[in-house]
Curated annotation (Swiss-Prot):
Keywords: Acetylation, FAD, Fatty acid metabolism, Flavoprotein, Lipid metabolism, Oxidoreductase, Peroxisome. Induction: By infection with the bacterial pathogen P.syringae pv. tomato strain DC3000. This is Probable acyl-CoA dehydrogenase IBR3. Pfam families: Acyl-CoA_dh_1, Acyl-CoA_dh_M, APH. Its cofactor is FAD. One of its GO terms (biological process) is root hair elongation.
Amino acid sequence: MGSSTGDLVTRIQSAHRFDHDALFRFAADNVSGFPTNPSQFKVSQFGHGQSNPTFLIEVGSGSSLKRYVLRKKPPGKLLQSAHAVDREFQVLRALGEHTQVPVPKVFCLCTDPAVIGTAFYIMEFMEGRIFIDPKLPNVAPERRNAIYRATAKALASLHSADVDAIGLEKYGRRGNYCKRQIDRWFKQYLASTSEGKPERNPKMFELVDWLRKNIPAEDSTGATSGLVHGDFRIDNLVFHPSEDRVIGIIDWELSTLGNQMCDVAYSCMHYIVNVQLDKEHVSEGFETTGLPEGMLSMPEFLLEYCSASGKPWPAANWKFYVAFSLFRAASIYTGVYSRWLMGNASAGERARNTGVQANELVESALGYIARENVLPEHPPSVQRDVSPSYESLVDGSGRFIPNRKVLELRQKLIKFMETHIYPMENEFSKLAQSDMRWTVHPQEEKLKEMAKREGLWNLFVPVDSAARARRELAATENKHNLSGKSFDQLFGEGLTNLEYGYLCEIMGRSVWAPQVFNCGAPDTGNMEVILRYGNKEQISEWLIPLLEGRIRSGFAMTEPQVASSDATNIECSIRRQGDSYVINGTKWWTSGAMDPRCRVLILMGKTDFNAPKHKQQSMILVDMRTPGISVKRPLTVFGFDDAPHGHAEISFENVVVPAKNILLGEGRGFEIAQGRLGPGRLHHCMRLIGAAERGMELMAQRALSRKTFGKFIAQHGSFVSDLAKLRVELEGTRLLVLEAADHLDKFGNKKARGILAMAKVAAPNMALKVLDTAIQVHGAAGVSSDTVLAHLWATARTLRIADGPDEVHLGTIGKLELQRASKL
């Protein structure tokens, strides 16, 4: 079992004692929400780790207790450039504020040594598990497997961070990383073994000579460069208290920009060697001693990482990267041993063996270099966790094969649709065409409760956004009176965009289905905006009721007087007036605003008409009941008004909204829009795949049951040919959409924008072609309301305009293609 993060503390070592009163005064002044008059203030030291001393701060009154983590430079004379806590703070803040990489939230940095003796920073305490022993003793085999897969995915997530976009472009030099690292760590080694310090090992010089002669060519080109953690091991990960997923990557002291394959190799050290501070010697790793049951082999771990990160198989240069990692570890352990001799090693007496271990690591590196084969030339063929029921989804095998969890959810979803949704479609349509169209069918609310019980609720919620919302809400009062199970249910099943794609497609087979599972537009996009960009108060006031399905929402962006496909044209004004904003303007095609349950709009307008054109727009949460909001009329789409949620034209006349409702801050609207539209567009594409499948199914059934000119439609050669071509186009589009989802998971909105644009162009055009042919096969019945085809077609046609018209997306695709060509 893993060790609880709170159980890894011990008494403060004498060499690391400092003024607790000074720390308290600093924290009270600089940490938001830090108790100022506590009855308890306790500082303990974490015993795990050999580098920057790390401490647990516990502060509170009565039964209320808050915990924080302090990380500081060690005292005494230090090696140049080592123990840079300011760099740790910088990278943690950038990742925490701008990415979904799981890291603890940082609160403040102090560089004044007068406070507690050395520089330090304070961050959140993450309640979870740390696995100190890579063998994962007392862990079930299937959980060992899941933990190592989660480790590989966490590393891939870290490596996907766009350093240029998050302000880390100058965090280090990217090219010639290994060359510089060899020089740096060799200098550190020499400094740690100078006169009066541990004796130098001649074999270290032999190892350095080999490394310098075998640096991969990719290192100088920067082809493998990006953010590097520098000490990525399983014991530097915090796992969820009960789930096998990473919630925090810690110990960033060695982070920089450079060759990311060095991180990958270092994370595999336990396969090569077994190094433990409480052991006198380095022993052999899992490759020699054998894998614990359920453990991934090194090739399987690498395959998991390469699949998640999109990196090529590293066989060609693997020997170098492992030898380099062993060399660096030897240099680090030599430095630890030198500090132990001086009496200021963070690990205390546990560091007494590091001198011997450093020399044994050098021997291990030279032994690894002498091996003929270290990694298979090609990645292993891993038997995926796939159910035989997948055969009904697609024949053969390929890259995008859903795992067992997704397949089980998919089967439940299909059964729910067949049992409850399809039989109710006519009833829902009748109400939507009656005088009571702007009311909600009572059966819909019953179906929602059933969907919750079945675990089919809020499946769209991305695992990273859910983690952020949980963190934000953890420190607030539970004013919604949610039990643990009810609270967890709000955040779905922890799916990636790729995994959700298989389920969203099923919902897309009916225009009525998405809202039953609380996965309908515009609510999903609005909820994701608040999940990603909302503060604690906004999450509590608006997101929780939306996630519960108690209210619905609208999105107000498009305006009748301007071409709104260019968001810089938006004219609606949002003027600051004291503690409020005053909104004036007209919006139309405000989806969801006609719904009687609609309580909040996300409105896009301009807060500064004189700012740079992409900094003029802001987004703000607007309560629908605010005076000055007037719904002028419902709008129709080819005659469909999409009751009961509808699309409204709305005027805003001096609508006063609290300033606290602004999302992310003034001038961030364009940024939010891009973040919202990426997943939102993809959800539309996924649903369109389902709509096309429904069209194919109805078309084939009709062709097999209706005769023209003496034979069934299915017997006409032209129909068979058309049907085959449509199937080819549908499958190609499905793969494109899944590829876009995969890119969105791995690389984020910005890097995936090209393939997202391709999917957004391809999906509606393909669906229209399929549905148009299905309508044609049905004849007059196809354009009537007796089938779902006309409504599905109208929705698909709208999506060639909504969330960006085809022309805008084609422009994006073309520009990226030209940029690619210009770099050749």
